Amino acid sequence: MNNVVIRTEFLCKSFGKLDVLKDISTEFYQGEVVAILGPSGSGKSTFLRCINLLEQPTKGKIYFHEQEITNPKVNIAKVRQQLVMVFQHFNLFPHMNVLQNVTYAPIKVKGINKQKAEQHGLELLESVGLEEKADVYPSKLSGGQKQRVAIARALAMEPEMILFDEPTSALDPEMVKDVLEVMKALALSGMTMAIVTHEMGFAKEVANRIMFLDQGSLAEDATPGEFFQNPKCDRAKQFLEKML
């Protein structure tokens, strides 16, 4: 059990009378790359947001290692330092340059020395191919560059797991490849990742596992080979016919 990073037990989320997540029980293992697929409105993003408690589950439990993080007494801010999220729309600070965006949280939240944080920040920007943009402000960057900065910012916290919420869906098609290449390199480095995505080729190539959500339920949990070649449920078959 000790290499399980996240475990969910009978996770439910409702908005009023709408049941968005229904009894999702699953585990994410260290070093695993899980692609979360499904039609629009199936609960994928809500599930991801529940994992680091940006959304409070209506019922059920979430464990980070053996700690129940749905317990109200848990310091959620501390947990989120280890479970960082990369959003669809980047969410960079517009009044800070690229390097300041990357180093802000390590300095303010973790108390890391500014010089050390900046050195690490420049290394991370180099790893995403943007070291020459360190002094540039977000308004001068393309969407793909902004998303790569957002990934560097997430990595600056040295997290245990990164949650990606449709990281390429707001990008122009020609920008998608650069972001996916960075994510692929991250996967190869052993980073634990959960990725809500519509990029089927990427999911097939990079993920170790596919979770397919439909109407808030975990309809299928399989290897990419099993899911793409021989999906079990009819809804997954219909989904793949449209997407591939």
Where are these regions (language model features)?
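C-terminal boundary and immediately downstream tail of ABC-type ATPase nucleotide-binding domains
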Residues: 212, 221, 225-244
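ABC family nucleotide-binding domain
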Residues: 3-224
